[in-house]
Amino acid sequence: MIYLDSSVALAHLLAEDRFPPEDLWQQQLVSSRLLEYEVWNRIHARRLDRSHGDAVRALISRVALLELATPVLARALDPFPTAVRTLDALHLSSIVFLRLRQQQVRLASYDERLIAGVRALHIPLYGPAVCCKPDVSDGGIGLAHLYPARE
């Protein structure tokens, strides 16, 4: 099972000349309900809902969305081994919640801080770990140089 982070979902939706690995989309995907809000927020901010709305709905329909249940929220209040942002704490808590229920979850992300948090918790990553520095050529989402260019 692959925990899909919004950085990968947005790269798939927005980065036309770059792309996440194709085999990712053949895996069982799960994420926090936050994924839906993060993706739509970015799509609306760029005024792409008309051009990308169907693709967003199709992508989100492929992902099992985990609600922000009390145990997830409670874990997010506890400290993490690395400094994390609020949404990252909720994503990490969701992954921990699944793993405590014997789910073999790996993270697919291009978010450097989220990857650091997962590594500190000894949770495996999907595929090669890819971190990045912000890149303004893709509108500031920091994804343009993460994927191999399409040939």
Language-model segments: which ranges?
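Acidic, PIN/NYN-like endoribonuclease modules and their adjacent C-terminal/linker elements
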Residues: 1, 31-32, 36, 99-151
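Short, well-structured N-terminal submotif of metal-dependent ribonuclease cores
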Residues: 1-35, 42-55, 123, 129-131, ...
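Short beta-strand scaffold positions
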Residues: 4, 31, 67, 86-89, ...
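Alpha-helix capping/helix-boundary segments
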Residues: 9, 35, 72, 91, ...
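Alpha-helical elements of the RecA-like P-loop NTPase motor core of helicases
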Residues: 11, 41, 74, 115-116
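Acidic catalytic patch
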Residues: 61-94
